[in-house]
């Protein structure tokens, strides 16, 4: 029996929408990374972008467990000497772009490389409850009801 490999024409992408209000960031990011990679599908092929498109709304209302909201530190470097910058999730959520908390969590749960960058483009995060993808008729996923630990 030959191994089945998915062809580009056989890829069937769905659209999902998840309301992030009250959800735990890490659990949500792990679930979304699985959807973006397509690992939930029986026809998953590692070298193809067979994952689905995911829309996350209410990104500014996510929760962190424990004291991570104040104690967790995100690092980035400018490239210049002494250019190490630090910030916390609390600063990001109260800042100009609160959706970046979820974007960073999901991006860091995907592998590195060109395929992961292409998969990450299928993620759409909005801080409010409105999104501009109504024409795609996304399926709503109630992530909080999948496990009691998903919601805080």
From Swiss-Prot:
Pfam families the record matches: Ribosomal_L13
TM segment ranges: none
Naturally occurring in which organism (per UniProt): Wolbachia pipientis wMel
Single Gene Ontology MF annotation: mRNA binding
Domain of life: Bacteria
Gene symbol of the encoding locus: rplM
Complex and partners: Part of the 50S ribosomal subunit.
Protein purpose: This protein is one of the early assembly proteins of the 50S ribosomal subunit, although it is not seen to bind rRNA by itself. It is important during the early stages of 50S assembly.
Family the UniProt entry places it in: Belongs to the universal ribosomal protein uL13 family.
Keyword Chloroplast: no
GO biological process: negative regulation of translation; translation
Lineage: Bacteria, Pseudomonadati, Pseudomonadota, Alphaproteobacteria, Rickettsiales
GO cellular component terms given for this protein: cytosolic large ribosomal subunit
Keyword Calcium carried by entry: no
Alphabetic keyword roster: Ribonucleoprotein, Ribosomal protein
UniProt name for this protein: Large ribosomal subunit protein uL13
Classification via HAMAP family: Ribosomal_uL13 (MF_01366)
